[in-house]
């Protein structure tokens, strides 16, 4: 996608993801058309969508007059014949790093206002019922998460099976991160580390640490660089893309 819009929850988490996504778009020679915040928990997003359209129409978006005959088009805006403005977005996708409940409502309203482009998201989408009960307007949407319990990876499946057997529940991202942290600490101790500083030094020198995401390594600032899971909403289910 070369031209992207962002609709993000006006929270610290939402602002951070919007900023990072915008930064990555520019680094990939893409273009950010518009970035608009919304209030988490709202149910009416007309004002936000209106701002998005207004900014887009200044650049690449277009509006044309079409017949508003519900009998022919199936579109009922007032239920009367006449003319209506049909909006064609100038962007290729919309990134919405919000909670699944908000995303479902927002996606439906985007479609109502003629914004039928692919939707992208973050781990807030990864809720058990989202793919099954959300409006079909999220069909084909793609989001990223640090863990996906339905991954076909043998390492992930072994962890999920053991976790479910022990706790009678599906592991969350936090459970997976806790498991990885404990396993890496144990690995460092096995290799001879006897202090916290020793564990840190060992981990910082490795570039193929075993994690549920695959081989990983730490950057100089202490960030664990690991693969993320790309997941698509497809026919009421979450399907891994990799």
Where are these regions (language model features)?
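Extracytosolic ligand-binding ectodomains
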Residues: 1-242
